[in-house]
Amino acid sequence: MSLDTVDKLVVFLAKRDGIDKLVKTFQYVAKLACWHVEATRPEAADRFKKWEVASGLSRKAFRTGRSLTGFNALRRNPGATPMIRFLAVLANSGEMVYFFFDHFLWLSRIGSIDAKLAKKMSFISAFGESFGYTFFIIIDCIFIKQRLKSLKKLQHSTDEPKEEIGAKISEIRGDIVMRLMGISANVADLLIALAEIHPNPFCNHTITLGISGLVSAWAGWYRNWPS
């Protein structure tokens, strides 16, 4: 029996990444809503701000232990070539720094440790995030280039039955789409991290942060949605 939309939603939300993307959507919708009404409806803006902050803190709690994900990825599947393995070490190391120091950022913001540490923890976490995601983007670009070459060969191949070629083409196209979604999410998160590392009018504008957050969340929805 195939899964319907409700079944898929239940499976999606059962995943830690699934609930994270839902709460991330709440966080950045609230950020944009707060910005939209802050001049005309300060009470509503305050409520949206509280929703944004609560969502952000909830996401940090959900990510407890996520620093082990990158370590396990390197341990189990470091990459097929020396170049990919090297890039994977850089990418996952950056992500591990991001998630590890994000734990301390969360603890400082809820008052469990010195609140003065929040700014330093936020900077280190954002630096690790931007470093790691830069290399994840490079890895995805390399794989997309390889997939496009394979796709071109298959489209001109006459050695296999059309059904098999069609299935392989569909699989390659699906992988390309997933990697494009990954690049979209990582670029969006990179902009958010840059706003913390090197504040500037573009990256720190509410519209930039809000749209980047939603792009990242919705790309994650697409990638984690059950097939």
UniProtKB/Swiss-Prot annotation:
MF GO annotations: identical protein binding
Entry keyword Protein biosynthesis: no
Induction comment from the UniProt entry of this chain: In seedlings by transition from dark to light. Up-regulated during senescence.
Cytoplasmic side: 1-85, 223-227
Any one GO BP annotation for this protein: peroxisome fission
Residue ranges, Lumenal side: 107-201
Annotated tissue distribution: Expressed in roots, leaves and developing siliques.
Membrane topology type: Multi-pass membrane protein
Top-level lineage group: Eukaryota
Gene Ontology CC entries for this record: cytosol; peroxisomal membrane; peroxisome
Pfam hit, one: PEX11
Keyword entries, A-Z: Membrane, Peroxisome, Peroxisome biogenesis, Transmembrane, Transmembrane helix
Parts of the chain that traverse the membrane: 86-106, 202-222
Localization annotation: Peroxisome membrane
Keyword Transferase: no
Matches recorded under InterPro entries: PEX11 (IPR008733)
SUBUNIT field: Homooligomer. Interacts with ARC5 and FIS1B on peroxisomes.
Protein family: Belongs to the peroxin-11 family.
Function of the molecule: Involved in peroxisomal proliferation. Promotes peroxisomal duplication, aggregation or elongation without fission.
PANTHER family per record: PEROXISOMAL BIOGENESIS FACTOR 11 (PTHR12652), PEROXISOMAL MEMBRANE PROTEIN 11B (PTHR12652:SF17)
Protein name per UniProt: Peroxisomal membrane protein 11B
